[in-house]
Amino acid sequence: MKGRLLQRLRQLSISNSLRGAFLTGALLTLIVSMVSLYSWHEQSSQVRYSLDEYFPRIHSAFLIEGNLNLAVDQLNEFLLAPNTTVRLQLRTQIIQHLDKIERLSQGLQLAERRQLAVILQDSRTLLAELDNALYNMFLVREKVSELSARIDWLHDDFTTELNSLVQDFTWQQGTLLDQIEANQGDAAQYLQRSREVQNEQQQVYTLARIENQIVDDLRDRLNELKSGNNDGMLVETHIRYLENLKKTADENIRALDDWPSTITLRQTIDELLEIGMVKNKMPDTMRDYVAAQKALLDASRAREATLGRFRTLLEAQLGSSHQQMQTFNQRLEQIVRVSGGLILVATLLALLLAWGLNHYFIRSRLVKRFTALNQAVVQIGLGRTDSTIPVYGRDELGRIARLLRHTLGQLNMQRRQLEQEVAERKEIEADLRAMQDELIQTAKLAVVGQTMTTLAHEINQPLNALSMYLFTAGRAIEQGQSGQARNTLTKAEGLINRIDAIIRSLRQFTRRAELETPLYPVDLRQTFVAAWELLAMRHQSRQGALSLPTDTVWVSGDEVRIQQVLVNVLANALDACSHDAVIAVTWQTQGEALEVYIADNGPGWPVALLPSLLKPFTTSKAVGLGIGLSISVSLMAQMKGDLRLASTLTRNACVVLQFSVTDVDDVE
């Protein structure tokens, strides 16, 4: 089964195999992507819940709790406010905190906002009740303070009056004792009067004791009110106690009706009893105090209940958010575990697929064959067209190998054809060069032939003079005139040197130039002079003149070729001028090149032939082959120079030659 599967895999083409591997990888990637996307979606949901709901709720809850704590602290200060101004300021601050809590509740859920709104409304109502209870308590305390001050004032008046009476009683008794001692006869009368004073004093002391009991009871009741240890039952007991004291006081007061000095004391006791017993005074004050204290206590209990509802709501909200967050976390952990397992399985399958693809397909079917094919291509690239391509098969690599073998066969055939064509072209080029060389040599011989008459004349004159000098030298020797003979022979030697220079110049010009002759420094001005001397017959008959610069320049080239070019150019210039030919030569350096301008005073270039003057067999002369300029162009190219045609400002013909400048050091 495994071998059959491997065989089926080997029969698949590379594209189908790669397509199958790509589809499998894409399927695994799709599975991993879907699982990852689902996990990402769940994580994103939890993050959105955390950012949009959980953290805002927690933040709002903490802010609400913070403002609630501030409100509680200020409420405690509100309960202990020393005056109405401070209480009103604290009430305003508490209301502001409640309003802020209401604004912060917008971050909670709807049900929680509704519950919190009810609690806030109850809190505002409770705050109003507390404020009312505190206000009533403040009024009652003011009234209690007034009663306490009134009792103290009456007690002080009673004490002052009592002290005055006691002093008066003491004075009366002292006076009576003095009178008894002074008037023994009226002693009984004075003793009776002394007993009456003592009886009055005793009644006054009884009133003082009753007054002290009344004051102590009133003060005790008021202190009990202030300490919060009183209730409605004690008020009734207080009234009954004062009624008993009033009965006792009335009995004593009736006994004092005969003593007008005690009227003030009796009135003070009546006022104290009125304070303690009249309904709209101390009894109502005590009842109002107890009621206000009870209302304040009830409001405080309601405050604790409201705060408990606040905290219960906040704890429930925090607990609900925390529970929901835990549920999200547990669900996300489960999803992460499942998705992680799926991703792990898909990763293992992808690794298994990659290993199988690499082991059974890439290494065996692709890498080895690609390597062999690459080595064959490298050998072909190195020029080894006889290399073999050892790759076969029916897949893409096999087809590429077959195409490459076919292409290699065609390349070999084309290479052989190209080699044959190159050999033929080399033969043709050699023939062309030989023919060009023959043409150059023919042109040289034509120039020599044209100058033979001048050369014969130039050589004939020195020969005639030489014959005469030799005859003169012989006669001088016969006559023994050795000095004259020596001078004559010296002149003859100069003529021989002149003839030798003419012959050498002619031989130098007619020497065949070798194509492979290396370039060397050439004195361009001297070469111009030599070429001009070769054309002496022509320029003398036309009264020609050659103008050369005075400076010496050295160029890179071959003297024979340069002389041939100059002879062709100067001959054309002389032919263009019928008489009085003037040929002006100038040169200038352009970087590493020397440009030579050769201009004549002839009619200029023929416009009709100007585009083809540098082509072979193009001439405006009646007699001539028209190959001089084309040969000159070829010779300049061989010396890495150039020849161009131009015109002067006066429309005379001008030939521009370009040479490479040679250093003086190279010349030396």
UniProtKB/Swiss-Prot annotation:
This is Phosphoglycerate transport system sensor protein PgtB. It is an enzyme of class 2 (transferase). Keywords: ATP-binding, Cell inner membrane, Cell membrane, Kinase, Membrane, Nucleotide-binding, Phosphoprotein, Transferase, Transmembrane, Transmembrane helix, Two-component regulatory system. One of its GO terms (molecular function) is phosphorelay sensor kinase activity. GO terms for cellular component: plasma membrane. The keyword Cell inner membrane applies. It catalyses: ATP + protein L-histidine = ADP + protein N-phospho-L-histidine. The gene is pgtB. The modification Phosphohistidine is found at residue 457. SMART domains: HAMP, HATPase_c, HisKA. PROSITE patterns: HAMP, HIS_KIN. CDD domains: HAMP, HATPase, HisKA. It comes from Salmonella typhimurium (strain LT2 / SGSC1412 / ATCC 700720). Its EC number is 2.7.13.3. It is found in: Cell inner membrane. It holds the Pfam family HATPase_c. It comes from the Bacteria.
